[in-house]
Amino acid sequence: MANQENVELLKTGVTGWNEFRKEHQEVSPDLSGADLRSLDLRRAALSGADLSEADLGGTDLSEAELVYANLCGALLAEGQESRSGAANLSGADLTRAALADADVTGVNLSHAKLIGAELRGAKLLRANLFRADLTECNLCCALNYANLSYANLSGANLSRADLTDARLNGANLTGANLSHADLSGAHLEDAVFGATILADIDLSDASGLDTVHHSGPSSIGVDTLYRSQGQIPDDFLRAAGVPEEVLLYLLPLIRRRAQVSVAPQG
């Protein structure tokens, strides 16, 4: 449960709060479950704070420091539970922050630093992550319609992530794990691949594969070729390091089998 003194001090304004944090660096503020809706917390010093289950709907947290902050289960989104609109976290430092199971639907996280952040089970539907730094972030979560354009996703864990209709154009996906992810309708124009894990996923409905830049070979499973029914550009596969024998012999076989399976029965 939140420390009410901490809560009241924060509500008086960022200037006094930041002075308190500077003078009492040993204190880890307990703001868990607090009602912090619609506050102006721009540039607030919230590193190490416990904000789990807090209601931050409509709160402006742009450029706030949230390094190692605990936001598990926090309400950040515009929705029925928090009626104050989505929080603004643009440019915020959320390095190593815990956001597991947090509702971040529609939240502005553009240019935010989320290096190593824990986002398992979080809802990031329609979230704005434009140019966000998600290096080595755990993103096994819902990212439907999210804007990840030009985001740094190098080394990120996106296994089983729902990236339906997500915008990944220009995103850095080197070393990212996309195994079992749903990329239906995803936009990959000018994305960067290299040492990217593409196991057991369907790439047939993703757009822009022919414009992807390859910094090196990636890992593409045969299961991905079958699930995609061979509907992956040859140039993409070749640049990703798929052996020429696979392109010459296995890929045509997969494509023919797919055509036969959809042919009308006479």
Which role fits each region the language model picked out?
Residues 18, 29, 245, 259-262:
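Residue-level signal for secondary-structure boundary elements
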Residues 228-251:
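Structured, non-catalytic alpha/beta "coupling" segments that mediate domain-domain communication
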Residues 23, 256-266:
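Conserved N-terminal substructure of TIR/SEFIR domains
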Residues 7-8, 16, 20-234:
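Tandem repeat scaffolds
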Residues 32-34, 248-257:
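Short linear loop/turn motifs
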